[in-house]
Amino acid sequence: MPLLNHLKEYRAKIGVNQQEMGTLAGVSRQTISQIERGDYSPSVTLALKIAKIFNVSVEDIFEYEEES
């Protein structure tokens, strides 16, 4: 799983649950859960929406890790 994310940590910082985060981002709670678990890689559009919610860059939330 080369795409790591810090979504859960950022979500905790602003005190929203997965359902509320999904509403803010325009997706379901299940999608947020899948992203946090690393089971789903968001589209570029969704990654940008999520970053905008936290007023940070996409790279602050999502990291690409090279496979060795």
Regions found by a protein language model. Name each.
Residues 5-24:
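Short basic helix-loop element that most often maps to the first helix and adjoining turn
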Residues 10, 24-25, 35, 64:
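Residues in the recognition helix of alpha-helical DNA-binding motifs
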Residues 19, 30, 59:
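Residues within helix-turn-helix
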Residues 27-41:
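Recognition helix of helix-turn-helix/homeodomain-like DNA-binding domains
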Residues 37, 56, 66:
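Short, conserved catalytic or interaction motifs in soluble domains
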Residues 45-60:
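DNA major-groove recognition helix of helix-turn-helix/homeodomain DNA-binding modules
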Residues 62-68:
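Short, charged recognition helix plus adjacent turn
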